[in-house]
Amino acid sequence: MTDKITIQWLSADGMVRGEADGEQSATLRPAEYAPGDRLCFSGARYLWVRVAEGVKESMVFLPEGGFTYPIPQDEQAIQGFAPGTFAGAQTVTARRAERSEISAYRNLALNPADRRLAEEVVDPDAPEWSNPTNSEAVAGGLVECFPHAYANRVTRNEGCFYARNAIDGLSNKGGHGVYPFHSWGGAVHKDLSLTVYFGRAVTVDKIILHLRSDYGLNDKGQEHDTYWNVAILEFSDGSEVEIHPEKTGDPQEFPFAPRETTFLKFKRMDPVQVETSLNFAALNEIEVWGTDNNSL
């Protein structure tokens, strides 16, 4: 017998404000959220989750069969969402993933419900290569929901540049800043590193990059953005792949030999630096395509 799919709406002090469950799916419609409110999802290791009507549904992997989602409410956390996403009554859904969906070839990096944990906040102005390139939250078993993105730098620690923005399924060309132009960015540092953790072994064979492309000119005739023309991808088996992105906001596909891995890391990212640009390189979205190795 399988567990029921359950969604709970909890207050800051743990009081249950609302709850819904079902054998295969659950739908809850919380009223206005209060500070500190959170949603708790449980019932399966693979769930299709939608945390708000304005957020894409995605399949997530839950090692312990559940996860808690604090409602984004502070000034930084909401910058990667459309205004009003978590205001007023919202329909929240969860459904059990079917075997065929779990085993399907798909984008394994998609998770609009991803979030930055407190243990992952780093100094945006630290000396080069001094910030950790691995997530201490993942290492400490604190991440409940995968895929999960982590970066060793976030520009000014602003929410519109969080690593989670690169796996939320949204990509808009020609701008930068808050939604809908949110991205992952680490300013103009040369030691930037981004990792997508899958939480279990998967087999991957290509990535699709959506580079940020704010190429509008300022009053000095300079473009805001540049791009990485060399990047080294590292996998948990120790293998590496070198790719060469181009200057475009269109999706760029990079296939490689299939490999089993628990993460994909941008180990090195070399930006093109020219006088006609402010030389900010950033990522709107990364897709990592492959299959799940679990037989569930």
Residue ranges and their predicted role:
Residues 198-201, 257-259:
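Hydrophobic loop/turn residues within beta-sheet-rich immunoglobulin-like superfamily modules
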Residues 188-193, 214-296:
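Trp- and acidic/polar-enriched beta-sheet ligand-binding modules for extracellular glycan
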Residues 1-197, 212, 217-223, 294-296:
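Disordered, acidic Ser/Thr/Pro-rich linker "stalks" and the adjacent N-terminal cap
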Residues 204-206:
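Contiguous beta-strand segments within globular domains
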Residues 33-34, 44, 202, 226-228, ...:
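Short proline/glycine-enriched turn/loop motifs at strand-loop junctions of beta-rich domains
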